[in-house]
A protein has these predicted regions:
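Perimembrane loop-to-helix junctions flanking transmembrane segments
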Residues: 21-30
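Internal alpha-helical transmembrane segments
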Residues: 31-108, 112
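N-terminal ordered "arm"
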Residues: 17, 69, 150-151
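Residue-level marker of motif borders
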Residues: 27, 62-64, 381
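Alpha-helical transmembrane segments of multi-pass membrane proteins
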Residues: 6-20
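Short hydrophobic alpha-helical segments that form membrane-spanning helices or hydrophobic packing faces
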Residues: 5-6, 38-42, 76, 387, ...
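Soluble non-transmembrane domains of integral membrane proteins
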Residues: 89-391
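N-terminal membrane topogenic signal
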Residues: 1-2
Length: 391
């Protein structure tokens, strides 16, 4: 019966994952107590069968090996779940990293305040597994040197991003579009501020020496660049030059080109506010949003945190009376006792296809007291100091 229920449960999890999300399937099936109990009962039954059917005899060696295999598989699942840790280590070619981002997600809270005249900090870290398809309610009751506060769940949304929502009473923003590595990205430069985009400074109505300064005067827009550039008016394909340190009219919907960087200002400045909105399929930064209620000293503040698996975002800060709270949601950045350099990433495609890849391989260098090269690909795992790296 157990051998029938186990594959049925796994099949159910697969369907739930495709219908809803991976995290929903984990909450309902894979991480549920009943699924773990099912695996535990299976392991106990396999161990009991060894004695019951006298599988330790030479004649039944093949059956013994089969039973032991299942036992070790289930033990491995237990170790991975409760003792091991998983994560992702993103590295660009010719870069080095000594940390990875945890597969598990956490709510991290720093609380700053005074205790007997001395500034103190308390850290809270709570592992969360959330999905917008399940009931995520939780409440964290804590104190900061006998000052009680609580953090409670309000809402959770998947696949969102931060975007500009038009509002006549909002701040003015001008949109810039660039695609340095072939991926389209949109940036909004707030009026009166300076933004760093791909290590190039841009300002909007706030002159900054060494930046590409955009100004608006009586409904007209101007650009002044610290270096020479060219532009192409996309509607007419007419070319023009942008001279260094010369204030010129800004050509909207035109492609500006400087060495190693291309950008477009597609439209005039807009008034609006930045809010969490549903992400489009083409958006590069797709995150989750966790909404919380923070209650302290009889006052409640609502907090919206962007993050999720694979993200380590800056904390969102707020002050309630005499306590400062800094909250973030996402993965942990875990340090390794060694470094890995990615020398080359090789992706091979099936013949005659554009987006169907047949294999991947990473040529890396492990940097520690001893340094060595290694190729990571399918079925060729890098094992080093208790860590296993897969491609």
């Amino acid at each position: 019966m157990l051998l029938v229920l186990f594959p049925i449960a796994m099949g159910l999890g697969t369907f739930l994952e495709s219908w809803y999300s991976t995290d929903a399937a984990r909450i309902w099936v894979y991480n549920a107590w009943w699924f773990e109990a099912l695996m535990l009962l299976l392991m106990v039954n396999f161990m009991g069968n060894i004695k019951k059917y006298n599988l330790l005899s030479r004649e039944k060696l093949s059956v013994l090996i089969l039973h032991l295999s299942f036992i070790f598989i289930l033990l491995g699942a237990f170790v991975t779940r409760y003792i091991g840790d998983e994560g992702v280590m993103p590295i660009r070619e010719n870069n080095i990293s000594n940390s990875y981002l945890s597969e598990k997600t956490y709510l991290t809270v720093f609380i700053d305040g005074e205790n007997e005249g001395v500034t103190e900090r308390k850290t809270l870290k709570s592992q969360l597994l959330l999905s917008e398809h399940v009931n995520n309610d939780f409440i964290i009751n804590e104190n900061f040197y006998n000052k009680n506060f609580s953090i409670s769940f309000d809402d959770f949304r998947e696949n969102v991003t931060e975007g500009l929502v038009l509002d006549p009473s909002g701040e003015r923003y001008i949109k810039l579009v660039e695609a340095v590595d072939g991926n389209r990205r949109e940036h909004y430069i707030k009026e009166g501020q300076i933004s760093s985009i791909q290590n190039i400074l841009f300002s909007f109505n706030s002159y900054q020496k060494g930046a590409i300064n955009i100004t608006s005067e009586a409904g007209e827009y101007f650009i002044e660049s610290p270096f020479d550039a060219q532009f192409t008016i996309m509607s007419t394909q007419q070319n023009g030059n942008l001279s260094k340190d010369v204030k010129q009219p800004l050509e909207l919907r035109s492609l500006y080109q400087i060495p190693g960087f291309q950008f477009v200002f597609p439209e005039p400045a807009l008034r609006g506010v930045f809010e969490i909105v549903d992400a489009e399929v083409t958006d590069r930064e797709i995150e989750d949003a966790l909404y919380l209620n923070l209650n302290y000293n009889g006052k409640t503040e609502k907090v919206a945190l962007l993050g999720g698996r694979g993200y380590v975002n800056s904390p969102k800060s707020l002050t309630i009376d005499d306590l400062d709270f800094h909250l973030s949601y996402g993965s942990n950045e875990v340090q390794l006792p060694f470094s890995i350099q990615l020398n080359d990433f090789i992706a091979e495609k099936y013949p005659g296809t554009e987006n169907s890849y047949s294999s991947f391989m990473s040529k890396v260098t492990v940097q520690d007291k001893e340094t060595f090269d290694y190729d990571i690909f399918m079925n060729n795992i890098l094992n080093y100091k208790g860590y296993r790296f897969f491609q």
